[in-house]
Amino acid sequence: MIPASMEEAHQLESRSDDLSQRRSYWRWRKQDFFPEFSFQSFSTYKSALSATCPRLADRLLSRSSDAYELDAARRESENPMRRCLTWWDLLWLSFGSVVGSGVFVITGQEARVGAGPAVVLSYAISGVSALLSVLCYAEFGVEIPVAGGSFSYLRVELGDFIAFIAAGNILLEAMVGAAGLGRSWSSYLASLVKNDSDYFRIKVDSFAKGFDLLDPVAVAVLLVANGIAMTGTKRTSWLNLITSMVTVCIIVFIVVVGFTHSKTSNLVPFFPYGAKGVVQSAAVVYWSYTGFDMVANMAEETEKPSRDIPIGLVGSMSMITVVYCLMALALTMMVKYTEIDANAAYSVAFAQIGMKWAKYLVGICALKGMTTSLLVGSLGQARYTTQIARSHMIPPWFALVHPKTGTPIYATLLVTILSSIISFFTSLEVLSSVFSFATLFIFMLVAVALLVRRYYVKDVTPEAGLLKFLGFLFLIIASSIGVSALWNSGVKGWIAYTVTGVIWFIGTLGLALLPKYRVPKVWGVPLVPWLPSFSIAMNLFLIGSLGYVAFLRFIICTMVMLLYYLFVGLHATYDVAHQPLEEAKFEGER
């Protein structure tokens, strides 16, 4: 059930008002951080640790429910978030989050050494892949319109453990990404002012290389962006809308000028690096499409989720794909791909046609793009943290929503402090080595979760049906990994790819022939299981294109998070799931 009606929202608000009258928002008692029975004393904690194995088995097999996420979990915040966003707000929040400085840097690099003029096809391929993930997010956002986004979706369909590991990694990468944006913002501003990207940084020779350039400007930018996010969601949305309009005007200028000074001869040869170059560039430019998942976290603050979320997310991603393709085409038609400056493609291209002043427009657009990405990222990261805190995987104190602003101030402060510390000390070179493995991993898991949601309902799906579903799902995942491994190991010839492709087709066709045990109430992904299955394949293929450093970092971070989960998160969530309160039970009616 979806409590999206005004009456249900009123009921939640009334209960929250009664509770907030008895408690002050500004509090920090031990009970606010660790209210669970396992943490009441050393003896209870020792007893909990001794029961780690059976508790882990319980949480591995336990899933949350729609009802719990929509009602009981939200009450952990004591005050409701305000439903103040429309599809128009979501569309531009997504635009502001996704369209940053990356397109100005990556397009030139990939056109020069990756795909040539065919980089426009790379953007189209990545756009389609991102759109498939958007469709999955949109269906879940309509069905479970809460602040946690993918964390809640995975918790409902795949369970506590997988949701925590995935959420922990993506939250870490989101904070690292915010720190990187802060450092990039500082570099861009310094380049415009003094033509020296390190102009605002403080050199400390006694610190290790990569951590010896302190960046107070990056910290200031993060503090301002997160401070605005704390004052109110609607206010942040309006500011994002205004700045996004500036970006649109500059992009229109770039595209129009590019086409008016274009030469079709610059598009020949169109495939200088072959089909492989197009696909490899698609994996690189895909990062220009990330960020929409932060907007999915705003579902709880959307006025009409069933209408606004599909229009906002799907509409924005479609628009962004067209914008990126036009920008790539304009650049490659304006300048021969062999003459494109990989480091400052658009600025140098305009200089070649006598418009040196246009580099300032590009710089302003990049700065603005990073600013809106920080603003929307601040909103999304805080709400992700809020939902994790509602589950008690981290202290529930971070789930509290301020009664006046309707925003999770404590959660925002947490991500602000952590990302500011990272940005102050860590260089862009170090941050750029942290690839967005978890982002693709979660996109893949959300597609898997959508298939689970359609084909498996507890106590309804027969055991034979479940086994068939798991078998076909295994074929889809295994064949997708196989294609990625073949491609990235440089295997040539069509036989191996044909075999893996046929296996993927058989797995997907098998799912298509199985009966579905749940249908979307209002809006759903079309062509299930084909589109989610293709999304799984695309995301696994892109994961395979990452270097071994990304895999190693993911494994290390996961191991650290696993330690935290075994010593803290596991026992907190176990206590909440088994406390004698109806609203805290996980095994709701499915």
From Swiss-Prot:
Glycans are attached at N195. The keyword Acetylation does not apply. It is a multi-pass membrane protein. Signal peptide: none annotated. Residues 1-85, 136-160, 231-238, 288-310, 381-407, 451-465, 515-522, 575-590 are cytoplasmic. It comes from the Eukaryota. Its main location: membrane. Residues 107-114, 182-209, 260-266, 332-359, 429, 487-493, 544-553 are vacuolar. Coiled coil: none annotated. The chain crosses the membrane at residues 86-106, 115-135, 161-181, 210-230, 239-259, 267-287, 311-331, 360-380, 408-428, 430-450, 466-486, 494-514, 523-543, 554-574. It is found in: Cell membrane. Keywords: Amino-acid transport, Cell membrane, Glycoprotein, Membrane, Transmembrane, Transmembrane helix, Transport. Pfam families: AA_permease_2, AA_permease_C. The keyword Lipid metabolism does not apply. GO terms for cellular component: intracellular membrane-bounded organelle; plant-type vacuole; plasma membrane. Expressed in roots, stems, flowers and leaves. Mostly present in young and rapidly dividing tissues such as the shoot and root apical meristem, and in young leaves and petioles during seedling development. Belongs to the amino acid-polyamine-organocation (APC) superfamily. Cationic amino acid transporter (CAT) (TC 2.A.3.3) family. PANTHER family: CATIONIC AMINO ACID TRANSPORTER 8, VACUOLAR, INNER MEMBRANE TRANSPORTER YGJI-RELATED. Permease involved in the transport of the cationic neutral or acidic amino acids. This is Cationic amino acid transporter 8, vacuolar. It comes from Arabidopsis thaliana (Mouse-ear cress). The gene is CAT8.
